[in-house]
UniProtKB/Swiss-Prot annotation:
Belongs to the pantothenate synthetase family. This is Pantothenate synthetase. GO terms for molecular function: ATP binding; pantoate-beta-alanine ligase activity. (R)-pantoate binds at residues 61, 155. It is found in: Cytoplasm. It catalyses: (R)-pantoate + beta-alanine + ATP = (R)-pantothenate + AMP + diphosphate + H(+). The gene is panC. Keywords: ATP-binding, Cytoplasm, Ligase, Nucleotide-binding, Pantothenate biosynthesis. The lineage of its organism: Bacteria, Pseudomonadati, Pseudomonadota, Gammaproteobacteria, Enterobacterales. It comes from Buchnera aphidicola subsp. Acyrthosiphon pisum (strain Tuc7). NCBIfam families: panC (TIGR00018). The active site is at 37 (proton donor). The reaction proceeds by a bi uni uni bi ping pong mechanism. ATP binds at residues 30-37, 149-152, 178, 186-189.
Amino acid sequence: MHIIKTIKVLYREIKILKKSNKKIGLVPTMGNLHDGHIKLILLAKKYSDIIIVSIFINPMQFDNLSDLKNYPKTFMKDSIILKKYHVDILFFPHINEIYPNGIEHQTFVEVIKLSKILEGQSRPGHFRGVTTIITKLFNFIQPDFAFFGEKDYQQLLIIKILVKELNYMIKIISLPTIRLKNGLALSSRNNYLSSQENEIAPYLYKIIKKTCEKIIKEDDNIRPKIIHESKILLIKKGFSVDIFDIYDYKNLEHPSKKVKKVILLASVWLGNTRLIDNKKIILNY
């Protein structure tokens, strides 16, 4: 595995790979790798000749400085994992390489509408940071494919819009959420959970599933009551609820009666840890 820390060296390597007509797959990460990342790498291998994983803890997408400071930095462990799974290139740049003039003076890229709602409303500037670093990585690496998990569904949708509207010739491939046996969605932030919170956290997906089952069975006019009861149940379990509702699968607007494909999005706090999850539903009209 070739570890690259500068854009100049990365450009040189990409130029060689492009001349050889190699299909490049990109898996962007912030490190602290888990089984979800590994599944993305294995998926990338099915499509790509060359696998590039980036590790960059992007300060531009953090709305909380203490969250940025406390984010796990596990480069040695991560590099061992990436070597084990035969990743070709690890791009591990310093912050000054990505933002040489500082974040305050950085030109940014933003998908206007979707970046302002739901998670974007709760975390101002977060998605602007995501789309800016993803745009930079796409420009540096020029991948044929890029791989993202479906747990961060709003982020996935935003990146798909970014690719379409900026005319990138990149295929975005998503991976269904990877879960522990108890149903908890894998996330680097799960490391923040205390032992007691780890016992409570799986209830999030259990309640999501139950809610979806009820929504499918009941009439439209009962839906607000079902959502409200689920929020109360989450609060009783110890969660603080930020987002818990169903949205149009394509645009995250509140669904009209004609829309069949919807998604239940959940964003909650458990102690000091933010957990997000979702489940797709096909409504029976």
